[in-house]
Amino acid sequence: MIAAELAACFPNKIKSLSLISSLGLWIESSPVTDFFILTADERKQLLWHNGESEIAIKKSTVPEDPSERALINVNRTITLAAIGKFCWPIPDKGLKKRIHRINMPTLLLWGDDDKIVPSDYGQLFNDLITHSKLIIIPECGHIPQLEKPQEFLSAINDFIGAI
């Protein structure tokens, strides 16, 4: 979302753009999941195509050590506060009015099973950005760079190689 905003505001300063499962637009019939009201288990099930996969379990396991657990909670609180400042109550801060300014090659990467920001948003970004390419990664949720790293890196490398 922030990258798209910067690209729309400063298109002459940006050579290329990659948006991964990005917020920034709003589709009334396909709302973005309110990430802030989710329990830890709901978050695990919604972030990943398979909430029981090795990466999902690794990323959602809470450490036994109280100091480590406290540090994770502090980091999560800071992260959610920062995200909340930019993304809510509605993750549409007017980008749709500026998106026509994004004129650089743009890669849009989405998981086909993104339950946080559905792939409908990838299609909308693709429709609104002139020089964009949408890649939807199969059997993948909201975090393709972690859930499908090979496919993610292949898409990024192909994109960079083509510009």
Predicted regions and their residues:
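Conserved alpha/beta-hydrolase catalytic His-Asp/Glu region
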Residues: 19, 28-30, 45-104
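Flexible "cap/lid" loop of the alpha/beta hydrolase fold
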Residues: 4-9, 15-45
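Short alpha-helix in the alpha/beta-hydrolase fold that links the catalytic acid
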Residues: 95, 104, 118-126
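Glycosyltransferase donor-binding loop in the core domain
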Residues: 87, 114, 141-144
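Short alpha-helical segment within the catalytic ATP-binding CA
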Residues: 1-2, 143
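Short, hydrophobic alpha-helix immediately C-terminal to the catalytic nucleophile
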Residues: 4-8, 123, 153
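Short beta-strand/loop motif that positions the catalytic acidic residue
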Residues: 102, 108-110, 114
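Catalytic active-site module of serine/aspartate enzymes centered on a nucleophile-bearing elbow/loop
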Residues: 131-163
